[in-house]
């Protein structure tokens, strides 16, 4: 393994918030103490955190290549182990407890971000993600004559809501379809699982404690919206889904159905060590995926912290650029591939009531609408203006809580 030992004096900056992760490394504290400081001020989110021996930091941005989410400062003379992102796989195979420690820290951070997002914007709460809604899902599938799927939803409703208001009706539906009240048992100790075409792997609103890796076949991810099935994605061999189950035992936000005969690897906290040892490439991909989730939540929170509607719209455009890791240079251009209405929806605005913001947005010299599609003629100008809006909002918030 190629790790470096780095020494930092008291007060030395290891990296700065919003800086590029160059080189792409993260750190483990061998001796000393490091403070993480986040400039973005949001109620419910820790602004400062002190880390000590054995703790790690900078994993998310090292693994994804996104800008740093906080500044890291050595508060005493410290010795750090610098780990290049491409050595991560080797590191976790030699220390599976470290991989699980990273997962646990991700869980805490995501929960913190999600709670803050919920507190700021009620529209971000997904009220449908509740086991009691399994009954409604079963009813919808029953009416569409998808009886196997309906039976699954009703069985899960009885399992998770044994004293629910619709228990009698759920049992009646199952009797009509000549289906058992209890679903077939799944051997949780078995990693490899086989699903026939059109078989449900899990459904929205169902509590989950496993993620899945597709070994063979393909899986359709969908969600029922206003009585209509919306396909969110079709995943193929090598893809990972249901990954939030390793972080938080919340109900599923979507349904997964085998698009063809499938062989999956089911991973939970109990067999995660085995995955790390036997399939380190998959474990690395999983932690990279979770790192993306954290970065996305961080940027969503930063966007919500901007008070000015135009600032939020511009920042949302910048997020799309950052997601694709497009270099921001003077006069560099970018085609966002989205309409003005799409952009309004992305920040939770109603397109029928907020057209004035789009009109104001297109007055910017570096923004244009080309056949309804938003384009940027100068990414550096976009980046600079978003920075101004962000600083302005932070000053206002800090004054309120001073």
Q: What label would you give each PLM region?
A:
Residues 120-125, 297-309, 327-332:
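Short, Lys/Arg-enriched, Trp-marked, Pro/Gly-tolerant hinge/linker segments that flank
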Residues 6-9, 83, 126-136, 193-196, ...:
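Alpha-helix N-cap/N′ positions at the starts of helices
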């Amino acid at each position: 393994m190629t790790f470096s030992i780095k020494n930092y004096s008291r007060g030395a900056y290891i990296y700065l918030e919003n800086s590029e992760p160059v080189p792409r490394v993260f750190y483990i504290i061998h001796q000393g103490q490091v403070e993480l400081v986040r400039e973005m001020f949001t109620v419910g989110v820790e602004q400062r955190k002190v880390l000590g021996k054995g703790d790690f930091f900078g994993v998310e941005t090292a693994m994804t290549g996104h800008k740093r989410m906080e500044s890291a400062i050595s508060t005493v003379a410290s010795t750090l182990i610098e780990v290049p992102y491409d050595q991560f796989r080797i590191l976790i195979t030699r220390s599976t407890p470290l991989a699980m420690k990273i997962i646990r820290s991700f869980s805490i951070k995501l929960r913190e971000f999600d709670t803050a997002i919920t507190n700021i914007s009620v529209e971000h709460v997904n009220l449908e993600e509740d086991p009691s809604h399994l009954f409604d899902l079963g009813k919808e599938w029953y009416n569409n004559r998808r009886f196997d799927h309906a039976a699954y939803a009703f069985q899960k409703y009885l399992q998770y809501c044994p004293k629910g208001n619709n228990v009698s009706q759920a049992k009646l539906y199952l009797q009509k379809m000549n289906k058992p009240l209890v679903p077939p048992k799944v051997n949780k100790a078995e990693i490899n699982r086989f699903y026939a075409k059109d078989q449900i792997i899990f459904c929205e609103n169902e509590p989950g404690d496993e993620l899945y890796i597709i070994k063979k076949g393909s899986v359709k991810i969908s969600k029922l919206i206003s009585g209509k099935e919306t396909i969110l994605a079709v995943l193929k061999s090598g893809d990972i889904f249901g990954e939030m189950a390793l972080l938080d035992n919340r109900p599923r936000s979507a349904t997964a159905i085998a698009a063809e005969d499938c062989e999956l690897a089911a991973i939970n906290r109990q067999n995660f060590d085995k995955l790390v040892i036997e399939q380190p490439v998959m474990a690395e991909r999983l932690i990279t995926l979770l790192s993306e989730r954290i970065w996305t939540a961080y940027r969503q929170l930063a966007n919500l912290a901007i008070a000015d509607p135009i600032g939020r719209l511009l920042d949302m455009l910048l997020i799309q650029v950052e997601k694709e890791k497009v270099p921001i240079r003077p006069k560099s251009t970018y085609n966002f591939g989205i309409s003005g209405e799409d952009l309004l929806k992305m920040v939770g605005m109603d397109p029928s009531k907020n057209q004035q913001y789009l009109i104001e947005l297109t007055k910017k010299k570096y923004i244009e609408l080309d056949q309804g599609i938003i384009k940027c003629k100068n990414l550096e100008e976009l980046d600079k203006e978003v920075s101004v809006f962000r600083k302005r909002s932070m000053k206002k918030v800090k004054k309120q809580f001073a």
